[in-house]
Amino acid sequence: MGKKKFVNKNKAQTFHLVHRSQRDPQYHDENATERVLVSAETLNKTARRLNRQTLDEEYGSTIRPNEGEAANYGIYFDDTEYDYMQHLRNIGNEDATWVEAPATRKTQDKQKKQQIQLRDQPSILPQEVLPSEVELERTYQDQQSVPDAISGFQPDMDPRLREVLEQLEHSDINDEETSDFDEEFEKLVASGKADESEFYAQPFVEEGEKDYDEAAAAKAGKSEWEIEFEKFKLEQKKQPDVASSDGDFSDEPESEERDEVPELVSSSKSKSKTKRKARTALSSVSMSSSALFRNEGLTLLDDRFDKVEEEYTPIKDERELIDPDQKDVFDLVNDNQFNDIMDEFLVSYGPTLGRKKAPSRMSNSKKKSSLEELDNVRKMLGRARI
């Protein structure tokens, strides 16, 4: 009896020691190995290109024409070695008879629960010496820390995405704030239960009326003018509106002509406190061109734009076009002067003024009568009114 072979070449699995791929996620990991073991079958598959001709040469003679069609009829067994389609017949043929199989409810429920799960054969080697199952793409966009789609100045970016990016940039500040909050909370818990009278005796501070903390603002990276501006806005909110209160309770009597119907309070103002939600802290600097640095060229462009805008501004009142210091034309002309001018024009018209006319066949008496008629018409019309 011969010795048993240590390795059966027919059933053995061959591996090759190769360098780890650059697309492997563990390529830059110091703890990972530089070389990995890859099966010879996978190397052969990746080395040669699969096309229709090679597939026909390898599997064309062994594959049946109806192989794999049994799954369309509910037969999920492996039909590579046995043809299950030979037992099926089309309904309606002479040599076929329909026999309904008795199916119980339990078997139907089991069939619904059964699902096909394809699992790869587990490897006999540890995962540390094998390449990663997922490989990364080595394209330009995939190697960037921030993709071009969300990088740069984008005023139309989704505000929710902008808020997340801002929080990621200031992650250190948030960590410090949370640590300070935890310390204050621990001190508050250690102090014990508070007295109700002391709690209600504290001054009530509405949302947005906290005392301004310059240290926290400086830690957030704000400039001096931003800090001063926020302090000014906070003090402006705290001051009561004296003008509005005096106007509502004025003791001066008003006439009925000045009575006006007051405006109704809109529902949006009354519900502003109830609808208030967590929002991002908006800065006092806008993202428009007015917040950018203005050099001489941009300043000149702004002046030209303002001038063009004034030309296209609609005139609300036509009286603005009239100069109040300018005298009216009708005030400069007297009625007697106007009548003298008209008489002189009618008498001298024809031979000396205007275009040349054909010689008039009207006698002097008729001309005098026509002038007299014109004078009569004037007298009947009365004095000219302008």
Swiss-Prot record:
Its main location: nucleus. Residues 270-279, 354-368 have a biased composition (Basic residues). Coiled coil: none annotated. Pfam families: LTV. Residues 248-262 have a biased composition (Acidic residues). Keywords: Cytoplasm, Nucleus, Phosphoprotein, Protein transport, Transport. The modification Phosphoserine is found at S171, S179, S244, S245, S286. InterPro entries: Ltv1. GO terms for cellular component: cytosol; nucleus; preribosome, small subunit precursor. Residues 103-126, 198-219, 236-287, 353-374 are annotated as: Disordered. GO terms for biological process: protein transport; ribosomal small subunit biogenesis; ribosomal small subunit export from nucleus. Belongs to the LTV1 family. This is Protein LTV1. The gene is ltv1.
